[in-house]
Design a protein with these regions (language model features):
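Short, surface-exposed loop/helix-turn segments at secondary-structure junctions
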Residues: 11-20, 65-76, 105, 126-131
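Double-stranded beta-helix
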Residues: 30-35, 42-99
């Protein structure tokens, strides 16, 4: 983002979308689409950029429209500051968006990595680039599907 770039409205977690969820039951947390936003430049308090309503991913109710406005400061929207190299991790059930970028002397740059459970994906399958892959390696490259998936368990190696 360059100075003067307008923000992006607050979204996520506001209506039922089967890809945007956060659930904790029976000792396990489950969530839908997740994002890791790797900051390539410093973002200081008051700069703008990524903002969210902390804890909103756990809400069972749609926030009031007044709470979703970035124009009126009701104290619900928090801009996240981070140094270059930091990673902000959140799931799409979190109400989030982007505040207008204010600094004149630097741009905002970040790389977003998006992940989802295997049964929920917006992309197609990838071809396995490994020559003679193991069944476990092939499982990583399977196309998204819900039933009959191979479950990979962590194994210690020496």
């Amino acid at each position: 983002m360059e100075q003067g770039t307008e923000g992006h409205w607050l979204h996520g977690g506001m209506t039922f979308d089967p890809s945007q969820y956060h659930r904790f039951e029976h000792g396990k947390m489950q969530c839908g689409l997740c994002v890791a936003s790797w900051q390539l430049t410093d973002v200081q308090e008051g700069d703008g950029g990524f903002a969210c309503i902390p804890g909103s991913h756990k809400s069972n109710y749609r926030p009031l429209s007044q709470m979703l406005s970035t124009k009126n400061d009701l104290g619900t929207v928090k801009q996240i500051s981070a140094k270059a190299g930091a990673v902000i991790i959140f799931n799409e059930a979190l109400v989030h968006g982007t505040l207008p970028w204010k600094p004149e002397n630097r741009m905002r740059r970040s790389i977003l990595f998006k992940c989802s459970p295997g049964f929920l994906s917006w992309g197609g399958p990838s071809k396995c680039p490994i020559a003679d892959p193991t069944p476990e390696e092939l499982a990583v490259y399977e196309s998204p599907h819900r039933t009959g998936r191979v479950t990979l368990e962590g194994q210690e190696t020496s």
